[in-house]
Amino acid sequence: MGIAGFGGLGHMALKYAVAMGAQVSVFARNDKKKQMAQKLGAANFYTSVEECKEKFDLIISSIPTQYDLLAYTKLLKYGGEVAIVGIPPKDPQRNLDFGDLVLFSGNHKVYGSWIGGVKETQEMMDFSVKHGIYPEIELVTGQEIDATWDKLLNGQGNFRYVIDMKKSMENFKK
């Protein structure tokens, strides 16, 4: 299977897929997170989709921006699926774009998901505990929020940020 996008959602998708026994390839914009992807169990890491035509049964896209969905459907084997879990922007000028012919000629499926219900969430929490799956985080203080936001907007984010309230309050009192 493939995972497109290796940020907050993508790195968790990799951890879950590896724990379920999948051989996973990660697609990202550049090599900055290659070492981390390999450490978390990625079998392959690509910065281009060109070398992977008709290779995957499933691709999970966690990309939260506009991108060429057609490029990823071309990576699917016959009957393959793309699950979109990254929420694209609401800009009507920037919708996801893909060709109908690719879907029909390969009997592909494209679907999306935001979140499961209470039952599914509990199952994932139980699975996470059983397999030691937790997000990679970076603690930041309240004073670092603006700089952290800028990093996220510029594609320099590291998975998940958590505000350290204790340290923030200590800094505030100084």
Language-model-derived ranges and their functions:
Residues M1-V49:
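Mid-domain Rossmann-like dinucleotide-binding core that forms the NAD(H)/NADP(H) cofactor-binding site
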Residues F27-N30, S62, W114:
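N-terminal Rossmann-fold cofactor-binding loop
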Residues G80-E81, K109:
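Short glycine-centered segments of the SAM/dcSAM-binding site in methyltransferase folds
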Residues I87-G106, V118-D126:
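Rossmann-fold NAD(P)-binding glycine/threonine-rich loop
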Residues V118-K174:
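C-terminal hydrophobic helical "lid"/dimerization subdomain
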